[in-house]
Amino acid sequence: MASMKKASQETALVLRTCSADLTSHGGFQWPDKIGAVVEAPDWKKDNKCGHGLHGWLFGQGDHGCSSTVGEADAKWLVVEVGLSDLIALGGKVKFPRCTIRHIGDRASATQFLIANEPRAAGVAVIGATLQAGDKELCQVGAYGTATAGDEGTATAGDKGTATAGDE
């Protein structure tokens, strides 16, 4: 797993998924290279879906915005985006350009995101696997796994798993 310094206050880490061959909606081909700068060839600065690159800010959002999120062989990417470039679309964000910081599977990408994006700590990250101790809270997004100890609370989004102890 690649490492990077924590996301700055001027940038944010965004989670996204692609097909196993790194293609996304419309056949867009993502490069298979950490550090690659990616630009949307059809960028349009508006608040409509399409005409840009898309993902989940800090890993949180509507998993239904991706057709590949549930695929076992999906590639999970973490990309770095300038905050001033982000446009919120309700459940996802779009942006004109980004830098690829991680390419992997669900587990490695969500671990990378959480380790390098401090703002991900307070949100339900799609696909994350997290554990909490006794009397603690643990929350993850869709397709995630949350485990909390005795008298703890575990919450998972759609198609996720939550387990909490009871003694």
Q: Could you tell me what each predicted segment is?
A:
Residues 1-167:
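Short, glycine-biased loop/turn motifs at secondary-structure junctions and
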